[in-house]
């Protein structure tokens, strides 16, 4: 499954700097390349040391990591919900993304002009939130009118949708995002997903700080933490300008040394992608052999047939069973044959819930 994250924020907060940091071929580690698809769209690999270990064991012809698409969306301005500036295109680009990376300026620099005159990341957050909420309110009101009418005419599904839309309307009118509305059951979750509302998308607040605040943050970051504490959001602190400069260094060990000097064990890009996985409830399973070792992305809770379908739809349609080896067992025993002989290869049916790190082989018939 593809994962697309959109970088948003006001002008001059560091969106393009973050994108450039990610876009460096050395932004994460020696073997994590970045492919520029368009000037504002790229695809970067998901860092996973387990895949590297499997490749060392299997020595395959090719190793294929999971990927994340990153979109640098044009800076939002007040009035975007009315189509001002690049508003319409901005909102359309967000709608296509699975998650929002909301960059907030958390550094002082007199040489970098702020559109509102001074640095205030909480205010900046509220500006973006308001524009998205206004657009969502327009969408909700239009769909609520139709769903309400159909529900009163006896359409049970429309009635359920109308009930959820009514709760969204109350939240939006109170200045809250749709993601703040509790969903009552899986059925409502499915309805919510198909509404494609902007403020329902998972969000990570990326606090762009100065070099001295890279490890521990600063007062601006703490203000953001307080403002979003009830949002179920991820927060990432990154000195994007500094990390972009470090990413240009050729030698991997030298880059790591500079990160350590900042008090960091891993680059902000690695932490960003890991945070996006947590935010979206994603996990990884592997296929491993002499021809290929590959990481595959699924949702936490997905069952074996669903995982098979990520590889090919025919695998899901004709699913018979899955052979599963736990990652730690494979690393300890080195081969599928050894795992089978040791009783560490399990045969699982269609109700098996895939675990993070499972190494899987699917049997199917079409």
Where are these regions (language model features)?
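C-terminal-of-GTPase-core extension/linker across diverse P-loop GTPases
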Residues: 2-8, 13, 19, 146-355, ...
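Conserved G1/Walker A P-loop phosphate-binding module
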Residues: 1-113, 141, 147
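Generic signal for short, ordered secondary-structure residues
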Residues: 16, 33, 69, 119, ...
């Amino acid at each position: 499954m593809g994962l697309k994250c959109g970088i948003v924020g006001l002008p001059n907060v560091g969106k393009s700097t973050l994108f450039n940091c990610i876009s460096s071929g050395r932004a994460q580690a020696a073997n994590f390349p970045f492919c520029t698809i368009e000037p504002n769209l790229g695809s970067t690999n998901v860092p996973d040391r387990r895949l590297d270990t499997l490749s060392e064991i299997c020595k395959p012809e090719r190793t294929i990591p999971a990927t994340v698409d990153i979109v640098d969306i044009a800076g939002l301005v007040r009035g975007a919900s009315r189509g001002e500036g690049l508003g319409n295109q901005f909102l359309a680009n967000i709608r296509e993304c699975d998650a929002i990376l909301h960059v907030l300026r958390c550094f002082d620099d007199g040489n970098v002009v702020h559109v509102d005159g001074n640095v205030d990341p909480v205010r900046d957050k509220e500006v973006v939130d308001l524009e998205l909420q206004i657009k969502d309110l327009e969408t909700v009101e239009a769909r609520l009118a139709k769903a309400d009418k159909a529900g009163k005419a006896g359409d049970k599904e429309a009635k359920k949708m109308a009930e959820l839309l009514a709760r969204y309307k109350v939240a939006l009118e109170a200045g809250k995002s749709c993601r703040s509305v509790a969903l009552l059951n899986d059925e409502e979750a499915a309805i919510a997903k198909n509404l494609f509302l902007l403020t329902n998308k998972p969000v990570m607040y990326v606090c762009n700080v100065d070099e001295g605040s890279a490890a521990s943050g600063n007062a601006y970051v703490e203000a953001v933490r307080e403002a979003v504490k009830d949002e179920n959001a991820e927060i990432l602190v990154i000195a994007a300008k500094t990390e972009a400069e470090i990413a240009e260094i050729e030698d991997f060990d030298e880059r790591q040394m500079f990160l350590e000097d900042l008090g960091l064990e891993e680059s902000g890009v690695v932490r960003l992608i890991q945070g996006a996985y947590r935010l979206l409830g994603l996990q990884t399973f592997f296929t491993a052999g002499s021809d290929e070792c590959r990481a595959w992305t699924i949702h936490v809770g997905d069952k074996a047939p669903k995982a098979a379908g990520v590889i090919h739809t025919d695998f899901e349609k004709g699913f018979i069973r899955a052979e599963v080896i736990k990652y730690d067992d494979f690393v300890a025993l080195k081969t599928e044959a050894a795992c089978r002989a040791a009783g560490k290869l399990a045969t699982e049916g269609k109700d098996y819930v895939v675990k993070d790190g499972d190494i899987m082989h699917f049997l199917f018939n079409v």
